[in-house]
Amino acid sequence: MNVFEPRLSSWLENAGDDDDVVLSSRIRLARNLKDEQFPVYEQKEEIVDNIAEVFDDNFTLIKMNQISLLQKALLVEKHLISPYMMNKSEYGAVLLNEEENVSIMLNEEDHLRIQCMTPGLRLFDALEAALQIDGYVEEKLSYAFDKEFGYLTSCVTNIGTGMRASVMVHLPGLVTTKRIKSVIEAIRSLGFVVRGIYGEGSMPASNIFQVSNQVTLGKTETEIVEDLTQVMEQIIMQERVARTTLKQKFHIALEDRVFRSYGLLMNCRIISMKEASDAISDIRLGVELGFFEHISRQKMNELVLFSQPAFLRREAGRDMDELEEKVIRAKVIREILGDK
């Protein structure tokens, strides 16, 4: 297993329910050990070793103090660790399975953060996988748990189930029809959070948004997932309506925009992250509307991931200035799109 190779994780490579709109679903469980201090102010490497011993050879342990900053950034871009772990968790580590759809962060904000990812809208599948791992760990290690408050976590907003359920969605139709603001306001009024592609603190890119639950106390894991699934079903329906409206009422203008973006990416020699993200979103929309039969969703996911800064530095084999990064990005994008 070489997680640093330029390949898609299984949750970005395989098909899933409603994957014309939904890229992926994720369940994350935050847990702390009963007899250890948290928040993790004094990050103890022995905590990592003790937890890692619980897992078998199906998982690979990667310690943050044994890899380079570039390798950490690659893990962030693949959504396998958080930006927090990359920047602040010197004695942190991550356990990964071969498919890269299970990532267990150790000594991040909490002792364990178990996250399971699935393609499309499959929150219940992700929940089942996460709870199975959680139960396995709890048989061998004692969690910090309170009968009244539930699982105790470093951040009070995670107390209770300790669960964050999130869905990554592509919403170009709602953005183009200028309905995205009202949709986000409606989502927030229902107690959910809308963030960028890399979660808290990140901005949307390629018209990709992340929707997650805010409440973790007072509801069961199943109830939270049911509520989020219902919200996502409404968002999916509204996005599809917006796409249909664009295709029916503004077909020529839409087709022109999509093919201009395709021409840009096929022929560019210098391109910024913002310009590439906008064009990739246009082409992904074109793929879903049937404009490009030769381009798969998998190829679109490759464009998003492999045009990120860390993957470009890996491709170049060195650090680059801003212009060099734009040149390498253009080259990588042309190669991906040209490989039919």
Curated annotation (Swiss-Prot):
It holds the Pfam family ATP-gua_Ptrans. GO terms for cellular component: extracellular space. ATP binds at residues 24-28, 79, 113, 164-168, 195-200. It catalyses: L-arginyl-[protein] + ATP = N(omega)-phospho-L-arginyl-[protein] + ADP + H(+). It comes from the Bacteria. Residues 21-242 form the Phosphagen kinase C-terminal domain. InterPro entries: Arg_Kinase, ATP-guanido_PTrfase, ATP-guanido_PTrfase_cat, Gln_synth/guanido_kin_cat_dom. Keywords: ATP-binding, Kinase, Nucleotide-binding, Transferase. GO terms for biological process: phosphocreatine biosynthetic process. Its EC number is 2.7.14.1. One of its GO terms (molecular function) is protein kinase activity. NCBIfam families: PRK01059.1-2, PRK01059.1-4. HAMAP family: Prot_Arg_kinase. Catalyzes the specific phosphorylation of arginine residues in proteins. Belongs to the ATP:guanido phosphotransferase family. This is Protein-arginine kinase.
